[in-house]
Amino acid sequence: MEDWVIVCQDITKIYRMGEVEVQALRSVSLNVRRGEMIAIMGPSGSGKSTLMNILGALDRPTSGEYILDGEQVSSLADDQLATIRNRKVGFVFQSFNLLGRQTAQANVELPLRYAGIRTGRRTRATEALEAVGLGDRLQHRPSELSGGQQQRVEIARALVNNPAIILADEPTGNLDSKSGEEVLRILLGLNQQHGTTLVFVTHDMEIASRTERVIRLHDGSIAGTDRQRVSVDGEKATWRLGIGDS
């Protein structure tokens, strides 16, 4: 039996602006296995951001079913969605979204504070920062850190609650190539060493090429899926599946 952490069935999202309706997603069905690493790609306006918002419990679909880590979240109230987000989703955004007056350690503690966790909060934040190579930067504020280090603080914050999934939206977009590679290696290591489920939303083919599966969106629908596997000599082979395969 498959262990699905994400199950989306016929997800449709319609935005209404006055009398005008914009259909951002059209009957999207997508399953993601626990421990899988995928990329969602597509041109601007393809529905990537809308799908990410739904997967991250930041928004609800207009219709369809979304089950995250065994919980039906499609029709939850705002406060229930907030609880699901805090417990089950870690976010890594292109912009670092750190509190400028707080230390790295305090920034990483935030999800634990929101969850009402008091015991061991500082220890868990410290361990998360050590996991991304920032054990010597606990008391540094964002202004005292490089861009790559700030992004690593955000990764530590994303993983401190042991989420079911981590959503990474263009995680290297604001970084130089060296810092971007360091951040990408940390994220890939979380998947390979700890089985963390990773969903990248990206335009970057380099990121996509290092995942197991690429979901291609076009005009709000899944236009196809590229599956990737590692051959005997370590090189990746890619083959294309038909429209809507997941």
Question: For each of these PLM feature ranges, what is it?
Answer:
Residues 4-217:
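ABC family nucleotide-binding domain
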Residues 1-14, 224-246:
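ABC-family P-loop ATPase nucleotide-binding domain
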Residues 214-227:
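H-loop (His-switch) and adjacent beta-strand-loop-beta switch element
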